[in-house]
């Protein structure tokens, strides 16, 4: 069962732990946006928020950000009307949910010759959540009622979300799915993870109608005021009225759609010959320190130094953050001098990721590479790698720096 949202614990200082995290999801229906940019954008907002609600978040605490892509507007009113309608639909959804969009990215140049990008507004929703409050998408076991939380108006939808959240906080929600392309898709994808079947309780519903904002939930007990659409079963099938299909068949069909683009299976290569070699000589590192010191330079824009330090500490290293100060030229010179001395006493350098200063224009990691090309720093880094058998790692922006410094692939 695919996940509809990403969840992450908030970064904390090394040595500390937290159960507080964030959950984030997106919403976008290209077909709906092409048919009606206003309705498509409005639905995108509701879909993104419904996904984080289904994952366990409280919609009252949600914030949004948008990405928009449209054709070149030129001087044609019809073209101007598409982003205007989309943004109006997104704004109305924000007002209905009291959820503000912060920042975003837009492009009004999506035209090449006579080809235009379709009207596109992608809504991203984010909210705080505790790890223990997260709800996953896969049916857990047979015999559970499957319920629909939905309403036709904004007030009815948010009331349904509040009811769902209260049940989730009470531990009565085993799994949940934010409906996008219909109830049939929802129960199918919820069935895939644990091969738990589903039998529909009613055929009166339109099982293939998109329902932006709707949530399907597997509950551990009966709820009299909610709409029960079916029940989970031990049979590995999905039954809706007279239609029945095996979960394995549906899984194969689901995976086959993009199999030619993103293969999930490898061809049988036949018998693979095994090669072995034995030697009495074993290489050992030149570093004879049980707890090596790892130096973490923190540049303006670096954003994963805490996670990097914690990972190194858990692996047994003595990790230290080194703040690169660049407020004045004297600060930079002082940072260079102190960093070169710190490298001399270290066995590992780890450059964390982020959007370092000077990334644009012309690519990333320019500030990092300029710093490491300083003669004093270069001398100590070369000594670390070539004479003291030290290590150097780079993450994201830091890895870009390793490439541009020439350290990848040849270590020089």
Where are these regions (language model features)?
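Short, well-ordered loop/turn and helix-capping segments at boundaries between secondary-structure elements
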Residues: 54, 189, 193-196, 221, ...
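Short, hydrophobic/aliphatic alpha-helical segments
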Residues: 1, 41-45, 161-173, 378-387
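Flexible gly/pro-rich beta->alpha loop and the following alpha-helix that scaffold active-site loops
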Residues: 311-314, 319-393, 399-410
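Glycine-rich phosphate/pyrophosphate-binding loop regions near the starts of catalytic domains
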Residues: 1-155, 202, 298-300, 346-371
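Glycine-/charge-enriched secondary-structure boundary and capping motifs
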Residues: 79, 83-121, 165-295, 302-339
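Buried hydrophobic packing segments
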Residues: 44-49, 164, 186-191, 368, ...
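A glycine- and small/hydrophobic-rich beta-loop-beta segment
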Residues: 140, 148-176
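Short glycine-aspartate micro-motif
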Residues: 23, 176, 197, 348, ...
């Amino acid at each position: 069962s695919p996940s509809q949202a990403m969840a992450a614990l908030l970064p904390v200082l090394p040595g500390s732990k937290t159960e507080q995290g964030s959950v984030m999801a997106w919403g976008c229906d290209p077909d709906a946006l092409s048919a009606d940019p206003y309705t498509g954008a409005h639905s995108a907002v509701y879909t993104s928020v419904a996904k984080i609600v289904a994952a366990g978040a409280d919609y009252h605490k949600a914030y949004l950000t948008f990405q928009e892509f449209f054709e070149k507007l030129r001087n044609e009113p019809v073209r101007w009307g598409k982003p205007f309608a989309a943004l109006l639909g997104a704004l109305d959804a924000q007002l209905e949910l009291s959820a503000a969009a912060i920042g975003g990215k837009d492009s009004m140049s999506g035209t090449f010759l006579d080809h235009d990008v379709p009207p596109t507004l992608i809504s991203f929703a984010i909210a705080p959540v505790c790890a223990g409050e997260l709800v996953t998408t896969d049916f857990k076991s047979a015999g559970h009622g499957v319920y629909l939380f939905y309403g036709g108006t904004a007030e009815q939808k948010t009331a349904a979300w509040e009811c769902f959240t209260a049940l989730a906080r009470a531990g009565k929600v085993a799994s949940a799915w934010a409906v996008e392309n219909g109830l049939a898709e929802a129960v199918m994808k919820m069935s895939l993870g644990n091969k738990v079947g589903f039998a529909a309780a009613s055929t009166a519903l339109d099982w293939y109608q998109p329902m932006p904002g709707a949530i399907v939930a597997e509950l551990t007990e009966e709820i009299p005021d909610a709409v029960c659409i079916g029940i989970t079963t031990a049979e590995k099938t999905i039954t809706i009225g007279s239609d029945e299909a095996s979960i394995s068949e549906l899984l194969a069909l689901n995976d086959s759609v993009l199999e030619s683009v993103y293969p999930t299976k490898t061809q049988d290569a036949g018998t693979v010959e095994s090669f072995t070699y034995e030697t009495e000589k074993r290489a050992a590192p030149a570093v004879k320190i049980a707890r090596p010191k790892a130096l973490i330079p923190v540049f303006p824009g670096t954003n994963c130094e805490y996670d990097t330090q914690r990972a190194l500490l858990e692996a047994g290293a003595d990790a230290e953050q080194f703040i690169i100060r660049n407020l004045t030229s004297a600060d930079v010179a002082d940072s260079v001098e102190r960093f070169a001395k710190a490298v001399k006493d270290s066995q590992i350098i780890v450059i964390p990721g982020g959007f370092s200063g000077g990334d644009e224009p012309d690519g990333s990691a320019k500030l990092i590479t300029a710093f490491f090309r300083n003669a004093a720093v270069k001398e100590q880094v070369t000594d670390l790698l070539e004479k003291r058998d030290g290590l150097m790692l780079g993450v994201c922006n830091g890895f870009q720096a390793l490439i541009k410094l020439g350290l990848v692939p040849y270590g020089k």
